[in-house]
Amino acid sequence: MGNRAGAHFCLASGLRLPSKGGVTIGVIYVISDSLGETAEYVARAAASQFDGGGLDIRRVPYVTDLDHLEEVVNEAAQEQGIIAFTLVLPDLKKKLLELAAARGLEAVDLLGPLMDAITRVTGGRPRLEPGLIRRTDEDYFRKMEAIDFAVKYDNGKDIRGLSHADLVLIGVSRTSKTPVCMYLAHKRLRAANLALVPEVPLPGELLNLPPEKIIGLTIDAGLLYQIRQERLKTLGLPGPAGYATRERIEEELAYARRVMDQLGCPVIDVTNKAVEETAGKILQIYYRRERNGK
């Protein structure tokens, strides 16, 4: 992935300017409800004007809930850092300003004032959707690479890809592994996936992965039964088939749970969740771990 270099990739990226006597005298937390690249560029530009002190820039992407927000602000308070943010969701922005004020922190809204000015001049209303900006340079090619990766290593086509993935999704058949991987690819994460089948031994490539690279997907047995029945109808196959019986589904789900427990990976229940919702939870897990250096 890009942006792996930096003084503090524990928060997705970092820039450290020369410091006096090797001591960092300032930390800027860049908080965003999307990737946060826009805010980071502005923070870098501002930091570059201060040659006399060390400024450590820590980007925290995909902050989309209040618990995550409070966690980051508390960390910033421990460092007495500056907060620069591009949050377009009003509730999150309001809460951030309240938390920062309560802790005596400087919090700078990099996007809001300009959006307010555009509204005053044009009379238009902002869409208030995170991540609308689209980049067509290096990020575009990284996205294309991630999409190619997801296609090449879909459903265990080539087990060698597991060790090169940013994330590996595991679960029984019809738990949305493939569409979630494609969604993650559009966020420039190289995601592979592997179906868990009781009769198929787990590959060594999976067993050798660190748990933080693996995400387990599970689903309600009743819903999975309906999905598989519909799948058989779509394919024009007669039922019932072993693949779609309740007994088989219960067996597969129990096996998958044992595997996930063995691997020690986080598990997400995809029951009645849209692909975007599942992917959003995965992104939160991924970037929190990056921020914590795990």
Curated annotation (Swiss-Prot):
It catalyses: N(tele)-phospho-L-histidyl/L-threonyl-[pyruvate, phosphate dikinase] + ADP = N(tele)-phospho-L-histidyl/O-phospho-L-threonyl-[pyruvate, phosphate dikinase] + AMP + H(+); N(tele)-phospho-L-histidyl/O-phospho-L-threonyl-[pyruvate, phosphate dikinase] + phosphate + H(+) = N(tele)-phospho-L-histidyl/L-threonyl-[pyruvate, phosphate dikinase] + diphosphate. Its EC number is 2.7.11.32, 2.7.4.27. ADP binds at residues 171-178. It comes from the Bacteria. Coiled coil: none annotated. Keywords: Kinase, Nucleotide-binding, Serine/threonine-protein kinase, Transferase. GO terms for molecular function: ADP binding; ATP binding; phosphotransferase activity, phosphate group as acceptor; protein serine/threonine kinase activity. The keyword Lipid biosynthesis does not apply. The keyword Nucleotide-binding applies. Bifunctional serine/threonine kinase and phosphorylase involved in the regulation of the pyruvate, phosphate dikinase (PPDK) by catalyzing its phosphorylation/dephosphorylation. Belongs to the pyruvate, phosphate/water dikinase regulatory protein family. PDRP subfamily. This is Putative pyruvate, phosphate dikinase regulatory protein. It comes from Moorella thermoacetica (strain ATCC 39073 / JCM 9320). The lineage of its organism: Bacteria, Bacillati, Bacillota, Clostridia, Moorellales.
